[in-house]
């Protein structure tokens, strides 16, 4: 994450050269999760892999006795997978093990020579190489050019052929959304029915602000979202 330094008011997990201990490793299997806390998030520094879950992923407890089963099935999630793929511009082939009702928005990005050679050699032994599924343009898509093979998907695509959250932000602002950057939400308030009524956030000067609204969408990540919910615990909804 070095190309995107953390800021004092919104640090992200750092492990090298020195740990900043942003994440407390309290479990038996430490996991050095890395992500960026900024507008656009970790999509500024990713390889754009956009794999869907396979069917068995949603029934880990039932099938393997570990974890928990999802509270709904793959079929309910599938339309939203495709909607996300359309928004980001995902390319790939259908042989990923995840059922699809509609094809990918784009055909796969051109295969590099090394991948082609490996696939051909493994085919002799009866092995199939499954192509990657990425939010990277194989052709012009939504005003952005196709991948030109710069091999710099991380830390950033130099021509915007690869999706990043900043694209969605630009689209939202063009539609009239007001973006408040450098704002770290630290608590959610709710009414007696449990509906969220306000969000409290600190700006970069550690000044607290309160925003009210009719609808709130919580879309941080698998760590920051539950963290915020725990910080927002109340008598009616205690932390568990």
List where the protein language model places each region.
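A short, glycine/Asx- and small/polar-enriched loop/turn
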Residues: 142-144, 191-197
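FAD-binding core of FAD-dependent oxidoreductases
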Residues: 37-47, 216, 220-224
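A generic secondary-structure signal for well-formed alpha-helical elements
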Residues: 53, 57, 81-92, 126, ...
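Glycine-rich loop(s) and the adjacent beta-strand/alpha-helix scaffold that form part
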Residues: 1, 174, 183, 187-191, ...
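Conserved redox-cofactor binding core of oxidoreductases
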Residues: 3-16, 21-28, 37, 47-49, ...
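Short clusters of hydrophobic/aromatic residues that line enzyme substrate/ligand-binding pockets
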Residues: 39, 58, 196
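Short, solvent-exposed loop/turn segments at secondary-structure junctions
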Residues: 43, 50-52, 136-137, 186, ...
